[in-house]
Amino acid sequence: MTSLVRQAPLVRQYPPKKVLFGIRHAEGWHNVLYDLIGMQGYSKFPDTSLTTEGMRQAAVAIAPKVDFVLVSPLMRTLQTANIMYPDTPQIALECLKEYPQEEHISNRRSETSLLRRLFPKVDFSDLTDERQPWPNPVDVDENVKRVKEIVMNAKAIRFAVVTHSTWLKYWMTGTCNAEPELIHCHPYKLVI
Protein backbone atom coordinates (compact mmCIF):
# COMPACT_ATOMS: atom_id res chain seq x y z
CA MET A 1 0.00 0.00 0.00
CA THR A 2 2.82 2.42 0.84
CA SER A 3 4.37 1.96 -2.60
CA LEU A 4 1.03 2.77 -4.26
CA VAL A 5 0.84 6.05 -2.36
CA ARG A 6 4.38 6.94 -3.46
CA GLN A 7 3.59 6.07 -7.08
CA ALA A 8 0.33 7.99 -7.22
CA PRO A 9 0.53 11.17 -9.28
CA LEU A 10 0.59 14.39 -7.31
CA VAL A 11 -2.76 16.07 -7.06
CA ARG A 12 -2.58 19.61 -8.36
CA GLN A 13 -3.37 22.13 -5.66
CA TYR A 14 -5.82 24.77 -6.88
CA PRO A 15 -6.31 28.02 -5.04
CA PRO A 16 -9.07 27.68 -2.46
CA LYS A 17 -12.53 28.55 -3.71
CA LYS A 18 -13.77 31.96 -2.59
CA VAL A 19 -17.14 32.34 -0.90
CA LEU A 20 -18.92 35.69 -1.17
CA PHE A 21 -22.15 36.95 0.32
CA GLY A 22 -23.68 40.08 -1.19
CA ILE A 23 -25.67 42.04 1.37
CA ARG A 24 -27.88 45.00 0.57
CA HIS A 25 -27.72 47.70 3.25
CA ALA A 26 -30.52 47.98 5.79
CA GLU A 27 -33.35 50.49 5.34
CA GLY A 28 -32.03 54.02 4.81
CA TRP A 29 -33.80 57.36 4.97
CA HIS A 30 -33.72 57.66 1.17
CA ASN A 31 -35.79 54.43 0.98
CA VAL A 32 -38.45 55.88 3.30
CA LEU A 33 -38.41 59.23 1.47
CA TYR A 34 -38.83 57.49 -1.88
CA ASP A 35 -41.99 55.81 -0.56
CA LEU A 36 -43.29 59.21 0.62
CA ILE A 37 -42.24 61.63 -2.15
CA GLY A 38 -40.98 59.48 -5.02
CA MET A 39 -37.73 60.22 -6.89
CA GLN A 40 -37.24 63.45 -4.93
CA GLY A 41 -36.34 61.21 -2.00
CA TYR A 42 -33.08 60.41 -3.78
CA SER A 43 -32.22 64.00 -4.64
CA LYS A 44 -32.80 65.96 -1.43
CA PHE A 45 -30.24 64.56 1.04
CA PRO A 46 -26.67 63.35 0.44
CA ASP A 47 -25.35 60.10 1.88
CA THR A 48 -28.41 59.12 3.88
CA SER A 49 -28.05 57.08 7.06
CA LEU A 50 -30.06 54.15 8.38
CA THR A 51 -33.47 54.58 9.94
CA THR A 52 -34.21 53.09 13.36
CA GLU A 53 -35.91 50.23 11.50
CA GLY A 54 -32.77 49.80 9.40
CA MET A 55 -30.64 49.53 12.52
CA ARG A 56 -33.01 46.87 13.83
CA GLN A 57 -32.86 44.98 10.50
CA ALA A 58 -29.05 44.89 10.64
CA ALA A 59 -29.03 43.86 14.31
CA VAL A 60 -31.32 40.85 13.77
CA ALA A 61 -29.92 39.81 10.37
CA ILE A 62 -28.23 36.45 10.05
CA ALA A 63 -24.66 37.39 9.20
CA PRO A 64 -22.73 34.53 7.57
CA LYS A 65 -19.26 33.94 9.05
CA VAL A 66 -16.68 35.74 6.92
CA ASP A 67 -12.98 36.66 7.06
CA PHE A 68 -13.37 40.16 5.62
CA VAL A 69 -16.08 42.68 4.82
CA LEU A 70 -15.83 44.77 1.66
CA VAL A 71 -18.16 47.73 2.07
CA SER A 72 -19.41 50.68 0.05
CA PRO A 73 -18.21 53.95 1.64
CA LEU A 74 -21.74 55.34 1.94
CA MET A 75 -23.14 55.95 5.42
CA ARG A 76 -25.94 53.38 5.21
CA THR A 77 -23.64 50.55 4.09
CA LEU A 78 -20.96 51.39 6.66
CA GLN A 79 -23.60 51.40 9.41
CA THR A 80 -25.02 48.08 8.19
CA ALA A 81 -21.56 46.46 8.06
CA ASN A 82 -20.64 47.76 11.52
CA ILE A 83 -23.84 46.45 13.07
CA MET A 84 -23.75 43.06 11.30
CA TYR A 85 -19.96 42.52 11.56
CA PRO A 86 -18.65 44.52 14.54
CA ASP A 87 -15.54 42.34 15.01
CA THR A 88 -14.66 41.54 11.39
CA PRO A 89 -12.05 43.58 9.45
CA GLN A 90 -13.70 45.97 6.98
CA ILE A 91 -12.38 47.69 3.87
CA ALA A 92 -14.33 50.52 2.22
CA LEU A 93 -14.13 50.50 -1.58
CA GLU A 94 -15.21 53.35 -3.86
CA CYS A 95 -16.15 50.81 -6.53
CA LEU A 96 -18.97 49.48 -4.32
CA LYS A 97 -20.94 52.75 -4.31
CA GLU A 98 -24.50 52.70 -5.61
CA TYR A 99 -25.38 53.23 -9.25
CA PRO A 100 -26.39 55.70 -10.64
CA GLN A 101 -24.01 58.36 -9.34
CA GLU A 102 -24.92 61.21 -11.69
CA GLU A 103 -28.41 62.10 -10.50
CA HIS A 104 -29.10 60.68 -7.04
CA ILE A 105 -27.44 62.89 -4.43
CA SER A 106 -28.29 60.24 -1.80
CA ASN A 107 -25.51 58.19 -3.45
CA ARG A 108 -22.81 60.85 -2.93
CA ARG A 109 -20.58 59.84 -0.06
CA SER A 110 -19.55 61.98 2.90
CA GLU A 111 -16.05 63.42 3.30
CA THR A 112 -13.38 60.84 4.01
CA SER A 113 -12.24 62.56 7.22
CA LEU A 114 -15.79 62.36 8.65
CA LEU A 115 -16.11 58.69 7.72
CA ARG A 116 -12.76 57.92 9.39
CA ARG A 117 -13.95 59.59 12.61
CA LEU A 118 -17.30 57.80 12.60
CA PHE A 119 -15.93 54.37 11.63
CA PRO A 120 -12.39 54.13 13.06
CA LYS A 121 -12.13 50.35 12.53
CA VAL A 122 -12.76 50.59 8.76
CA ASP A 123 -9.85 50.79 6.32
CA PHE A 124 -10.53 53.82 4.08
CA SER A 125 -7.22 53.73 2.17
CA ASP A 126 -9.06 53.17 -1.14
CA LEU A 127 -10.73 56.60 -0.86
CA THR A 128 -8.24 58.91 -2.58
CA ASP A 129 -10.35 62.09 -2.53
CA GLU A 130 -11.55 63.85 0.61
CA ARG A 131 -14.72 64.87 -1.24
CA GLN A 132 -16.17 62.59 -3.86
CA PRO A 133 -16.12 64.26 -7.29
CA TRP A 134 -19.69 65.01 -8.42
CA PRO A 135 -21.29 64.15 -10.72
CA ASN A 136 -19.37 60.90 -10.82
CA PRO A 137 -20.17 58.67 -13.82
CA VAL A 138 -19.69 55.02 -12.94
CA ASP A 139 -18.55 52.09 -15.09
CA VAL A 140 -20.40 49.27 -13.38
CA ASP A 141 -18.51 46.57 -15.34
CA GLU A 142 -15.17 47.97 -14.16
CA ASN A 143 -16.41 48.22 -10.57
CA VAL A 144 -17.52 44.58 -10.46
CA LYS A 145 -14.29 43.50 -12.15
CA ARG A 146 -12.23 45.37 -9.54
CA VAL A 147 -14.04 43.71 -6.63
CA LYS A 148 -13.52 40.28 -8.20
CA GLU A 149 -9.79 40.99 -8.63
CA ILE A 150 -9.48 42.11 -5.00
CA VAL A 151 -11.22 38.96 -3.79
CA MET A 152 -9.21 36.61 -6.01
CA ASN A 153 -5.89 38.19 -4.96
CA ALA A 154 -6.71 38.11 -1.24
CA LYS A 155 -5.57 35.34 1.08
CA ALA A 156 -8.97 35.36 2.80
CA ILE A 157 -11.59 32.85 1.62
CA ARG A 158 -14.95 34.15 2.90
CA PHE A 159 -16.17 37.69 2.23
CA ALA A 160 -19.25 39.80 2.82
CA VAL A 161 -19.84 42.50 0.22
CA VAL A 162 -22.08 45.10 1.87
CA THR A 163 -23.37 47.37 -0.87
CA HIS A 164 -26.57 48.39 -2.66
CA SER A 165 -29.48 46.70 -4.43
CA THR A 166 -28.67 47.90 -7.96
CA TRP A 167 -24.97 47.11 -7.57
CA LEU A 168 -25.66 43.55 -6.35
CA LYS A 169 -28.28 42.95 -9.02
CA TYR A 170 -25.74 43.91 -11.67
CA TRP A 171 -23.29 41.32 -10.29
CA MET A 172 -26.02 38.65 -10.14
CA THR A 173 -27.89 39.36 -13.38
CA GLY A 174 -25.81 41.72 -15.53
CA THR A 175 -28.57 44.36 -15.48
CA CYS A 176 -29.04 47.58 -13.51
CA ASN A 177 -32.80 47.39 -13.15
CA ALA A 178 -33.86 49.14 -9.96
CA GLU A 179 -36.99 47.04 -9.52
CA PRO A 180 -37.63 44.71 -7.90
CA GLU A 181 -35.28 45.71 -5.11
CA LEU A 182 -33.31 43.12 -3.18
CA ILE A 183 -34.17 42.39 0.45
CA HIS A 184 -32.42 44.51 3.09
CA CYS A 185 -29.66 42.64 5.01
CA HIS A 186 -30.27 39.33 3.23
CA PRO A 187 -27.05 37.43 2.34
CA TYR A 188 -27.11 36.55 -1.37
CA LYS A 189 -24.45 34.02 -2.33
CA LEU A 190 -22.37 35.50 -5.15
CA VAL A 191 -20.68 33.41 -7.81
CA ILE A 192 -17.08 34.25 -8.70
Model-derived segments and spans:
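Beta-strand elements within well-structured catalytic alpha/beta cores of enzymes
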Residues: K18-I23, L70, A154-W167
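Domain-level recognition of soluble alpha/beta enzyme cores
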Residues: T175-I192
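Active-site-proximal alpha-helix that buttresses catalytic centers in soluble enzyme cores
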Residues: V11-A92, R116-L118, H186
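A short acidic (Asp/Glu
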Residues: Q79-I83, E103, Y170-G174
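Glycine-rich phosphate-binding loop signature in dinucleotide/nucleotide-binding domains
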Residues: A63-K65, V151-I157
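A short, compositionally biased domain-edge/stem linker segment
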Residues: T2-Y14
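Short active-site segment of divalent metal-dependent hydrolases/proteases
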Residues: G28, W167-L168
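Phosphate-handling substructures
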Residues: W29-L33, I37-S49, M84-K145
